[in-house]
Amino acid sequence: MSSKKTDALLNWLITLTAIFGCSLTVIFFALSNIKELSIQEKIQFRNQALTTTAIVFLASTAMFNTYYAARRAQAMHKSAIASEKNLEIGLQNAKLNQDRLIAERFMGAIAQLGHEKVETRTGAIYALERVAQDFPQEHWTIMEILTAFVRENASIQHLKGEQQKPEYQGAIYSSRRRGGSRPTPQLEQNLHEEFPKIRTDIQAALTVIGRRNLLEDPKDQKLDLRNTDIRQADLLKTNLQQADLRGADLSGADLRGADLSGCDLSGAKLIRSILYETKLIKASLYGANLCWANLNRTNLSGANLRSANLSGASLRAANLQGANLYKANLQQATLKAANLSGAKLFLANLQGAKLGKANLQQTGLIGANLCGANLNGANLSGANLNAAKLHQTEVYFANLSEASLTEADLYQANLIGANLYRATFYQANLTQANLMGANFSQANLNDVKLEGTILTGAKNLELHQIREALGDRTTRLPDYIEAPTHWRQSS
């Protein structure tokens, strides 16, 4: 029914109500004028007429108010529906405008990434960063674009020549160890080789990637920076958690305070890189080259450094707790006050390494090469040094309590004042070693070679321990122990 018809019907109802009310009033007033009626009856009829009229008009008023209230409610409902539709249309238009704006800014920035001028490319990178910040739904897409830009424009250049191989670089330090020859001029040149400066646009892309909002990163997605040449990159305090950097060259890069936890750096090069206080928790550095890198106070707990080259690297006060360093090269590395508790250093090369006051508690060093290393004041309690090589190693006042040195070679090692409580030296070689003032309480010296060994001033050394060992007349025993007869008779 149209609004005009509804209004006409309402007008008819109003008119009929008014006529009905007036008719009742007229009737009651007419009845009140009958001459046969008493004055009291006339007054009664008139009062009844007025009351009836009032009731009719009050009822009419209530009906009209109810009607108009319903009409107002209906109108407001229609208005709300219309407003909701307008709002929905407005939101759709806003989304369309936003999508158009994103597309324009997005495509404009991407188009400029291929510009010939580095300034334009750099500006495009920062424009993409702003898009990622303003429109979080595009965050990961932009990160993928930037990583692809780095991979495309800074791909690794495979260096030619044997001198570039990690094992060859490590050999430089090998030649410097005791008795080694001086490196050739060519090797010295490689040692001090200057790395090329990173391109401005590549640095900008890495900066944007490194300071992105991690909360917007999707789960199970990784930044792909494989096989990239980002030498001398400034990655100070950047966040590259879980990034894929396999085969990347970060030589000379500044990674101080960066977070590389969970990163895959297998086969990566970090020659002379600065990783001071860097987080590499549970990172994979399998076969990585970290020659001469600064890893002081770096957190490498649980990291995989299997076959990694750390020759000459500085790891002062570094955390390597539980790390895997199987067959790692740590020649001439500095590990003073480092935490290597529970680490696996099986067959690792630690020739000439400095491990003074390091924590090697419960560390696995089976077959490790520690010749010429410095372990003064180190904690090796419970460590496994079976078949380890410790030629001329300095172990002053070190803690070797309950350590296992079965078949270890300690020829000419210096263990002055060492704590050997309950240590096992079964079939170990201590020939010409210096154990002056060492604590031998409950140590196992069964079949240990003690020819020329210095044991003067040894503490808690008992005769039965000496009888189990293999010494000779050159063995220097404490004053309170007499050499066994067969020792004195040996040539």
Q: How does the language model describe each region?
A:
Residues M1-G21:
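Juxtamembrane interface helix immediately N-terminal to a transmembrane segment
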Residues I14-I43:
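Hydrophobic transmembrane alpha-helices
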Residues T52, V56, H77, E119-R121, ...:
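Positions within the helices of HEAT/ARM-like alpha-solenoid repeats
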Residues L128, I202, L206-I209:
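Hydrophobic core/packing positions within alpha-helical solenoid repeats
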Residues L215-S491:
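Tandem repeat scaffolds
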Residues V131-F135, F149, N153, G170, ...:
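Residue-level signature of the C-terminal ends
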Residues G108-L113, V131, I145-I156, E188, ...:
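Alpha-solenoid HEAT/Armadillo-like helical repeat scaffolds in large eukaryotic proteins
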Residues L37-I145, H464:
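Membrane-proximal alpha-helical anchors
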